[in-house]
Amino acid sequence: MSQNSNPAVVLEKVGDIAIEQRPIPTIKDPHYVKLAIKATGICGSDIHYYRSGGIGKYILKAPMVLGHESSGQVVEVGDAVTRVKVGDRVAIEPGVPSRYSDETKEGRYNLCPHMAFAATPPIDGTLVKYYLSPEDFLVKLPEGVSYEEGACVEPLSVGVHSNKLAGVRFGTKVVVFGAGPVGLLTGAVARAFGATDVIFVDVFDNKLQRAKDFGATNTFNSSQFSTDKAQDLADGVQKLLGGNHADVVFECSGADVCIDAAVKTTKVGGTMVQVGMGKNYTNFPIAEVSGKEMKLIGCFRYSFGDYRDAVNLVATGKVNVKPLITHKFKFEDAAKAYDYNIAHGGEVVKTIIFGPE
């Protein structure tokens, strides 16, 4: 493709993805960088917008460029840029907060009410040839870390953030409900942080088999447990812990029965982190939360230092993200990539779309 073109993967409307030409972005802020996007992972949120046109309060009202799990190469820098240079390979943190909110000043910029997050309406995403980013939301990829691995840093950062929230350390016994990309990486980070037991729970045997590449010490298939069988599910998981409860439970599925079972699996005084996005409302045993004096913590994306730490985990070999990638597509086949993810959800873990040539 021409250096003077900027092809983009655009969600025109629900169920309609097209490749169209967008203007090549021009650096106007001296602290910004122009990037050539090299690899982008498909996220569940992209699929949700494609199928239904909205997530919560974020509704697709106009065509939007998809993608937010990306890596790229610096091709131009603003006059004030000092952290990166032309030619650097980087992972791109896709959410940029305001520089003035209380949340940002507190170091919790992921909670900034003015966050501009890629591929969250009305903000365009990263599935383009050229993309602009502030320099302080880029993390350089060390030699030996590929662009594909760099694209996996985004979901890995969620795993880093959730483990920090939970305080996982050496000896922690962990259960992860949901062995999708974020669940697998959350468990892998737990092992890297020192957890001695990491049990994955999912409905697909192939995903549980893959969990062994992400630090699983044991797995449990939950496909037979309906919503009213949460206690039975919790009992089954606890047997794998010698009849004990878990110190930390990460709920990464968003499924009602798993949320309920996660509470029941958490020990007295333990911690449950709700990582997965489920329905707006769900039923769970709140009396048990109080009676156990357990911590129930929400988790939203990632914040200061999480991207940096995620890159370091990959670069040092403490977390191997390569087994996460199950499918790869060329840029011009992006629409096929999304349709394939929908049609083969049980076998797909992470799909990578390469940048345009």
UniProtKB/Swiss-Prot annotation:
GO biological process, one term: hexose metabolic process
InterPro entries xref list: ADH-like_C (IPR013149), ADH-like_N (IPR013154), ADH_Zn_CS (IPR002328), GroES-like_sf (IPR011032), NAD(P)-bd_dom_sf (IPR036291), PKS_ER (IPR020843), SDH-like (IPR045306)
Disulphide linkage map: none
Gene induction: Induced by sorbitol.
EC number: 1.1.1.-, 1.1.1.9
Binding sites annotated in the UniProt record for NAD(+): 202, 207, 275-277, 299-301
CDD domains: sorbitol_DH
Record GO terms (molecular function): D-xylulose reductase activity; L-iditol 2-dehydrogenase (NAD+) activity; zinc ion binding
Co-factor requirement: Zn(2+)
Cofactor note: Binds 1 zinc ion per subunit.
Residues noted as binding substrate in the record, renumbered to the chain: 49, 154, 301-302
Described purpose of this protein according to its UniProt entry: Polyol dehydrogenase that catalyzes the reversible NAD(+)-dependent oxidation of various sugar alcohols. Is active with D-sorbitol (D-glucitol) and xylitol as substrates, leading to the C2-oxidized product D-fructose and D-xylulose, respectively. Is likely involved in the utilization of D-sorbitol as a sole carbon source for growth. Has no activity on mannitol and primary alcohols such as ethanol.
Similarity section: Belongs to the zinc-containing alcohol dehydrogenase family.
Subunit annotation: Homotetramer.
Name of the molecule in the record: Sorbitol dehydrogenase 1
Source species taxonomy: Eukaryota, Fungi, Dikarya, Ascomycota, Saccharomycotina
Gene name, Swiss-Prot/TrEMBL: SOR1
